[in-house]
């Protein structure tokens, strides 16, 4: 079976089909797959046609493809294609194996006229003739023409038999003035010979799928991004290691900060007298190192300052440098951590090198736990490198440098337990100094220090503020003074009064006042009785701390508060004092029950009950203050106690709380008149001091006039 390559012109693009000549029929294009391909690739998918028009074209195309030897079927298809698809008529007419008749010739002639293919017209007329008669030929050299015409097989000779009528019709249709076309080879004949030799190659353009185009674009963008990332990374590493970054930005942010003229002295640091005494030895060592080394002794070179935040560790280090009058190099622990491996160790070396050049000097690293945490196998390499370099420099310079020009290393941290043992061992940090929270005398000294440049009113008693700020650090006290000064300035006052200081303290302890909170008169009265119960029990209970202030002004989540102040800071408490503490705590709930009855008590006492339960539990399980339990510590073993022992512990806690509640209720019943007066005064004024509460309890009726004046 022979195969012939047929060019099919479909809408300006050339496609090629192989058609086989079967030994049973000799019919061309008899494969149903080829027919379907012709239909779907040609007219049916043409854009801009009505769907019904497309279906009609597809129908006639199927009929024409199924009857390739029937010229009438071809003519019907040409008729449908004549208006919109002249290229398709020309392409199909010039295809070998397609039957023709006079009607097909007319449609072909009309299609050529529309496309103005005059050369193709004359050549294809000669191609359709069955014999080369000189009488009917319009060319002067038939041999030259026949040389360019491809030979047909015997199967196609029967399909091209009606060419004289085509020649006659073409000659009659041409106008008289039209000259005879020259014998030029038609494009169709050249096209039919495409692919037959190397001189006439077939150019095939493969249309890529849309997914392939997108994937190629994505690969290009991804490759460009990766390449750009590595280029920028290399440039940043080069700029960091070569110092170009600092030159371009003109910054020394990560360089050791050196201060020579430090004005801080030990007199500026208050409330930490013990820490100052230990650091004074370091100052004397920096001033005269030979005085301590003449007998072979060595003073510590590394000092670790520990303690809660805000206690003055940084100020102590600056005071050491200021007293010794030596250069002071400061860096934070977080400044050693960078994204590049090795930068932290490099900065440690630079810090110690700069300090040695200026010796005697002081190196201070704040928040030392940022680089000195305990090491483990899971740590990143750069973290271990920074700590290792710090360990080497700490142990190295103390042995090799000149004793006449020492370098003292001071570190500060709030979490000494997190530091690596190799860092805190003797030889690196020889001395550990704890900087605690100040006691009442220390707080008073700090308040006096921070109010040196603040004008105070005549009514200000800083000792009362110091007694009421237990647990405040130096930074908290400085903030208290600053807020009071700002509040007084806002109120156009000429000096800071005691009321301004109390407002600032209450704001820090309890939060801002909620003056806009809507409270019904009933709830306000109940809150006044609740706070009055606390204050009254504190006034009439032996060993209880005296009430300092009572208020029903909402602050934070609290609707009111009664504050008691100790005379001094206490580290231990007696059993009587703990029982008095329980009675005062239960006074608020007892006052509610006394006024409204047991069924009208509220949930406002939940915080009081929680505190009282904690005190009673510690009395039983930690302090050995229970007669039935005895002097036994059970807090650490509560989970391992037997059910009977645990029940006994809970029973003792409950007994202490119930006894305290009954004592408070009995006291308030005996002082019901004073309770009513105290609650009424709180409703009227919302705030009572200790002196005002004493006057109300004694029946002073001039309180309103004195308070308003």
UniProtKB/Swiss-Prot annotation:
Give a yes or no for keyword Hydrolase in this entry: yes
**Where is composition skewed (Low complexity) in this entry?**
153-165
EC number(s) stated in the UniProt entry for this protein? 3.4.24.-
Keyword Nucleotide-binding recorded? yes
Q: Which molecular function terms from Gene Ontology are attached?
A: ATP binding; ATP hydrolysis activity; ATP-dependent peptidase activity; metal ion binding; metalloendopeptidase activity
Q: One biological-process term from Gene Ontology?
A: mitochondrial protein quality control
Q: Which residues bind ATP?
A: 307-314
Q: Where are the transmembrane segments?
A: 217-239
Protein keywords: ATP-binding, Hydrolase, Membrane, Metal-binding, Metalloprotease, Mitochondrion, Nucleotide-binding, Protease, Transmembrane, Transmembrane helix, Zinc
Task: Return the GO cellular component terms, semicolon-separated.
Answer: i-AAA complex; mitochondrial inner membrane; mitochondrion
UniProt cross-references to PANTHER family, sorted A to Z = ATP-DEPENDENT ZINC METALLOPROTEASE YME1L1, METALLOPROTEASE M41 FTSH
What does the record give as the function of this protein? Putative ATP-dependent protease.
**Which family is this protein grouped under?**
In the N-terminal section; belongs to the AAA ATPase family. In the C-terminal section; belongs to the peptidase M41 family.
Q: What is this protein called?
A: ATP-dependent zinc metalloprotease YME1 homolog
Species the sequence originates in: Schizosaccharomyces pombe (strain 972 / ATCC 24843)
